[in-house]
Design a protein with these regions (language model features):
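Glycine-biased low-complexity/repetitive sequence motifs
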Residues: 1-288
Length: 288
């Protein structure tokens, strides 16, 4: 590469003709409210926080691939001393020859996604609504989609005693007896998109487990007594140029005299206890 005026020139032939026949990198635009296309060094980062389109206008060169982070909406937790929602599915790719040098999450696959000249519709999954009072339930998070990559919404609470599966599973519920956390990485993909929700202990503890996170299972509810389990750990990636923790599970709800359980870094909401309300997950993080 010479400069912005002369562009790319061959070095293995006795000619100084500029290369014009082949697009070396892909060119693309984004559409949709609040969606952005920014520059980070020699690379472009397309960020979607709402529905839109990733429109590729040139992809004929040797680098017709893109790396991605597809993050689904977290699940909603249950009411009272209920279980917590699981984090939304977390799926990432990273290949240095595609996207340069940055630190990806431990969950990243080394296989970038091939792209062609077309418009790719983007689906951004919203978080599930939490239950406000028994028998209200926490809704499953919504899935996010880019091309062939689907991240599944986090598990919610199906009934006072049943936890849903999802990208990361919802936790066991602390009402009516011990509860088993929902399964994460459902449907299964490799690398896994999430982890199981935490279990809850016997009825006398009245505390839900923590929702599963991208980086770990949810904590057990009722240990210590009447205190909700911690949300499962999120995971860190620098795909946007800044190390950021995303996709932690929500913390489970407890009951008096237990204490509220703090939010786990990565967007998951805190767990309430007694007069302390539970907290919502943070927008655009995939937290439960």
């Amino acid at each position: 590469y010479v400069d912005s005026t002369q562009g790319w020139r061959p070095t293995d032939a006795s000619t100084a003709a500029a290369i014009t026949e082949t697009n070396i990198f892909i060119s693309a635009t984004v559409s949709g409210a609040c969606n952005t296309l920014t520059t980070c060094g020699d690379y472009k980062i397309a960020t979607f926080t709402g529905p839109g389109t990733f429109c590729v206008s040139a992809a004929g060169g040797p680098v017709a691939v893109a790396d991605y982070l597809v993050l689904a909406g977290g699940g909603g937790g249950g009411p009272d001393h209920g279980g917590a929602g699981g984090a939304g599915g977390f799926r990432e790719s990273y290949c240095a020859t595609t996207s340069g040098s940055y630190t990806a999450s431990p969950l990243a696959t080394p296989t970038s996604l091939p792209v062609s000249i077309t418009a790719y519709p983007i689906t951004t999954g919203s978080g599930g609504t939490g239950g406000s009072a028994t028998p209200d339930c926490g809704a499953r998070g919504n899935s996010s989609i880019f091309s062939s990559i689907t991240s599944t919404g986090g598990g919610g609470i199906k009934s006072p005693n049943i936890s849903m599966t999802g990208g990361s599973g919802a936790s066991g519920v602390g009402q009516g007896g011990p509860g088993v956390g929902g399964a994460g990485n459902t449907p299964p993909v490799s690398p896994p998109q999430g982890n199981n929700g935490g279990n809850s202990q016997a009825t006398a503890n009245y505390a839900g487990g923590g929702g599963g996170g991208a980086g770990g299972v949810g904590g057990v509810g009722g240990a210590p007594q009447r205190t909700g389990g911690a949300g499962g750990a999120g995971t860190t990636t620098s795909i946007n140029g800044t190390p950021t923790v995303r996709a932690s599970g929500g913390s489970g709800g407890g009951s008096s005299p237990g204490t509220s359980t703090p939010a786990t870094p990565g967007g998951g909401g805190r767990g309430g206890a007694g007069a302390t309300q539970s907290g919502n997950g943070t927008d655009n993080t995939g937290g439960g």
